[in-house]
Amino acid sequence: MFRTVNGEDYSPAVQQRNILDFGKAHSLLWTDNGSANDRCETGGNCRESGQDRVKRPMNAFIVWSRDQRRKVALENPQMQNSEISKRLGYDWKMLTEAEKQPFFEEAQRLRAMHRDKYPGYKYRPRRKAKEATEIASRRLFSTVQPNAHRGDVVPLPIQGRLRQGHTFTNGKPVKPLTAHEHKQLTPATGASQQLDKPAPQ
């Protein structure tokens, strides 16, 4: 009725093997490529797991900071990553050109290897989600003010980012929207409602 369990069944190595076996047996998305699984679990784009994304070659600072970051983290375990980055940036600036030279040479070698391995490579940075939504909202809520010359486009204040007196048309401040006006503003009716209002003199 009771099963005697061997102490080895709970060792970390056995547990890790059991987890891996379970994952392979029960997951449709499982691949033996660990980096693809890590990307999906850490919020990366899971669609890219089939086609691995090509990383940029490391520059001289990154080559140098790789080992330095490890050293600083071991010496100061309580230090935040952002603080470590600031310290590394300062330390890099303090190095002489002669001290930096081996890292520039290594970066050049890595760039050449990268160019040979990926001849058609072109760096294409991913646009951050927040940045993309801000651009879309600016386009959506931009309108021509009544006193503006034809073609002048002035963005409306969105979420309090523009402060009163800091948006100008023809040298005159544009009246910021009240909370009530902002609620009434929709993409379909925003421009016509705004054109009906005279600008302050």
From Swiss-Prot:
Q: How is it modified after translation?
A: Acetylation of Lys-130 contributes to its nuclear localization and enhances its interaction with KPNB1. Deacetylated by HDAC3.
Task: Drop me one GO molecular function for this one.
Answer: DNA-binding transcription activator activity, RNA polymerase II-specific
Q: Which UniProt keywords apply?
A: Acetylation, Activator, Calmodulin-binding, Cytoplasm, Differentiation, DNA-binding, Nucleus, Repressor, Sexual differentiation, Transcription, Transcription regulation
Gene Ontology cellular component list: cytoplasm; nuclear speck; nucleus
Q: Which residue ranges are recorded for the region named Disordered?
A: 162-201
Against SUPFAM superfamilies, the record matches this protein to: HMG-box (SSF47095)
Q: Any transmembrane segments, and where?
A: none
| Assembly information from the UniProt record | Interacts with CALM, EP300, HDAC3, KPNB1, ZNF208 isoform KRAB-O, PARP1, SLC9A3R2 and WT1. The interaction with EP300 modulates its DNA-binding activity. The interaction with KPNB1 is sensitive to dissociation by Ran in the GTP-bound form. Interaction with PARP1 impaired its DNA-binding activity.
Q: Could you tell me what this protein does?
A: Transcriptional regulator that controls a genetic switch in male development. It is necessary and sufficient for initiating male sex determination by directing the development of supporting cell precursors (pre-Sertoli cells) as Sertoli rather than granulosa cells. Involved in different aspects of gene regulation including promoter activation or repression. Binds to the DNA consensus sequence 5'-[AT]AACAA[AT]-3'. SRY HMG box recognizes DNA by partial intercalation in the minor groove and promotes DNA bending. Also involved in pre-mRNA splicing.
User: So what family is this one in?
Assistant: Belongs to the SRY family.
Q: Please report the name of this protein according to its UniProt entry.
A: Sex-determining region Y protein
Gene that this polypeptide is encoded by: SRY
